[in-house]
Amino acid sequence: EPSQFILTGSSVLPEADETIHSGTGRYAYIKMRPMSLYESGESNGKVSLADLFDDKPFETQTNDLTIDDITYLTCRGGWPWATLISKEVALDQAFDYVDSVVNKDIQRVDGVKRSPERAKLLLRSYARNISQQVPLSTIRKDMLANDSSTLDEDTVTDYIKALKKLFVIEDLEAWNPNLRSKAAIRTTDTRHFVDPSIGTASLGLGPKDLINDLKSFGFFFEDMVVRDLRVYAEALDGKLYHYRDSTGLECDTVLHRRNGSYALMEVKLGGKDLIDEG
């Protein structure tokens, strides 16, 4: 039917006084994310999250993707155009995106003048701490190591807020099940990008770099898994979180649905020992 969808840009929002109607009560908002591996055709989708919630049986699956394939997909990202072009050109898309964010969008998003160099430093710090629960103070210290000028946490917070408005950064909040437990919930967010290719591009990394540093690759791989799980979670009326308490009990991702059901998921790159640990 006509007028079912209104498609808009996402990087720079209009000024409040230019908005005629907020859309409340008239529009339903859909967050458009980078493509999941299922949407881009690299995942076979044989295991359904919806079926797992319904306790339906499933068979153990194997994936034909090699580790070289996965490092490439991590660096390529889920950008639609990148899925349609040659591999060499596809890897450039994330680098072009990061350049545009730090040199243009970071200032256009709300009209506040910001330093492209500091924006780069923040993205690099986030990439070094990807998929980890690090406080703002740690990110600030990491940035200060490469920034000779003064830098307070308020400034770091301002840049992070701007990057969240631009849909570049999307941290994973802590899940509190509200159970009667004496263990205190650790509330520090897990640091994530909306797409892992933003992190690899920020550090100037390619697929071979990840192959040569499998430990770092594991963190970027988790970032990619979180990207995909967020897509699937929203389709199930759910939201993704992480869990960690004062006793050391932790879980990489918690998919909590509006009906109260939830799933706990641990992310491992592969290998029997790591899978058994998970």
Predicted region positions:
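Short conserved micro-motifs at the rims of enzyme active sites and ligand-binding pockets
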Residues: L203-L205, E266, D276-E277
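Active-site ExK catalytic segment of metal-dependent nucleases
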Residues: A263-K272
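Short glycine-/polar-rich loops that comprise or flank the Walker A/P-loop
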Residues: P2-S3, T24-A28, G260-Y262
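Accessory nucleic acid-recognition modules appended to NTPase machines
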Residues: T83, K87-S261
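Short, glycine/charged-enriched secondary-structure capping and boundary segments
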Residues: T19-T24, G45-K46, G206-K208, R257, ...
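Interdomain motor-coupling "hinge/lid" segment immediately C-terminal to the ATP-binding subdomain
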Residues: S10, A16-Q132
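Sensor-1/coupling segment of RecA-like P-loop NTPase cores
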Residues: P2-T19, L163
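Short, intrinsically disordered, charge-balanced linker/junction segments flanking boundaries
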Residues: E1, G271-G278
